[in-house]
Amino acid sequence: MPTAGKGTYRELLRQGEHLLRRRVHPAPCDDAATDAFLLLEKVSGLNRTNYPLKKDERYPQAEREEYLALLRRRATGEPVQYILGEWDFMGRDFTVGPGVLIPRPETEQLAEAAIDYLRKRPKCRVLELCGGSGCIAITVAKTLPAANVTALELSPEAMEYLRANMARHKADNVTAVQGDALCPPPTIQGPYDAILSNPPYIASGELPTLQREVRREPAMALDGGTDGLDFYRGFNDIYPRMLAPGGLLLYEIGEEQGEAVAALLRNAGLERVAILRDVYGQPRNVLGYAPDEN
């Protein structure tokens, strides 16, 4: 029988919140209460539903020791998503860890816009550039099971997560291809009904100013060059011509990049170019369409 601790789960959670608020360096954890609870969930099996019923139960000592070890990792600035080993994207959990970009809620808008468009083309071919964990490609593929989705990713570390998530979600209609999106391998051949990407778009000079948790993510998934636009420029010379007639090119962008990226798409001959704003009113995506067949 596990050795009982001296306190209750309620007290242990309070201790976790206190540690993250007081001992995280160089600044306190902004989401101390949330992170403390997520880490307690991981070690105890408690959740938001059963915690109110069990908060006054005594915890096993082994759970406390494991919990404190996870808290110490979080206190050094390690992202809570890496500690948990998974994170939610549009209702599915994706395996993540060091070496891969963490799925973010704002990226869900890209996946939703792509799915809305592709529902009219159920037997579609889709290409995702800079596939990372596979959260976009797999979400599209699972929502549209008749789709044929290819995810292109350069990083060997990220490819491991991509393949693990394909297996986890039984995404048999996704193909993972390792290669450079700026110099795609010969297997990447159009026409595609949609080409999607959340590429690196942070200006190189801004990387040192990012939150310390973000700085733990791979630089190659963040660094977009001097002005953050290197990947969009490089893609512009390659991918618009891989679109099927009427096909969609859809990017995630930084808040100040909408007009510049929209201009690139227009210069590539795409039509109906538009900037999509997120729920906070900030530019979040740019899209354009290949001309329809006459």
Regions found by a protein language model. Give the residues of each.
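Conserved SAM/SAH cofactor-binding pocket of Class I
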Residues: 106-208
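Conserved Class I SAM-dependent methyltransferase catalytic core
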Residues: 226-289
